[in-house]
Amino acid sequence: MQLNRFMIRPYVEQALRDEIGPGDTTGGFLVGEDPVQTAQIYAKGSGIVCGLLLADETIRTVDPDARIEHMVKDGEDMGPGKVLLKIEAKASTFFMIERCALDWIQQMSGIATKTRRYVNLVKHTKVRVTDTRKGWPGLRMLQKYAVRCGGAHNHIFSLSNCVLVKDNHIKIAGGIRNAVEILRSRAQHTFKFEVECETLEMVQEALDCGVEVIMFDNMDLDEIKAGLKLVNGRAIAEASGGVNERTIVPIAETGVDVISVGDLTHSVTSVDISLDVKDIKPSAIRTIERLRAATG
């Protein structure tokens, strides 16, 4: 998965509307001639870089003439003091973009960093770590991109990607078989079917329906192992529910194919990132004397 400016522009514009509103009532009054200044965005914490394109687009939206040099790429390691972006832009630009640009990098790097920890924990197994749909509504695409930068894979992007039969679908349909039969009669032939199973009996029923993916939902290790014996290679075996950094290793070592982890996106600690303006030009500062002279 890759991001491009066309995809991210609506997110950037909304963030700037939230941040600037009708105008910057602090920086706008302090800046004088508004000369070009230099600045750096750099890491104060350690982790995996993500969100640089959003920071870049944030700056260019406010100042189309800005010059930005990327010192690292999304998905690379960073540590304290590492410079991520070098920027040349009008002095007023930095007041307006600082919070948004930093927030994009901090939050997305937080997801990528946590994801990398999970991936490293189970790299001795064949399991594929994926995200879920849990997270901030409206930002799913960005969160899933950050997961990829951290080295994991994406689960479905939306309910239109596959047939995912969950507990409430089963209740409404009166059982797995009826749900699958109804959905097979209506869904595109290209769709895979995944069924969320809470018991071994549900696993067997789903297998009898010929579904392509079995999700072991909140099962303990013994249940997962028993479920894998039932599956026996006839479907992709996915474990999900309550997975954390303490439990993922024993789950992976059962031999499941996929572990979906809501924790990648629903509980994130951001990475500390900062912006530092360099060599402030005297003409950038509007003194009270200059203001009085300008206003008569």
Language model features: what each stretch is:
Residues V213-L221:
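Extended hydrophobic secondary-structure segments
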Residues N218, G241, D263-L264:
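Short secondary-structure boundary segments
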Residues D263-T295:
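Short, charged, intrinsically disordered terminal tails
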Residues M1-C209, V213, K225-L230, A235-E238, ...:
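Acidic/glycine-rich phosphate/pyrophosphate-binding loops and surrounding catalytic core
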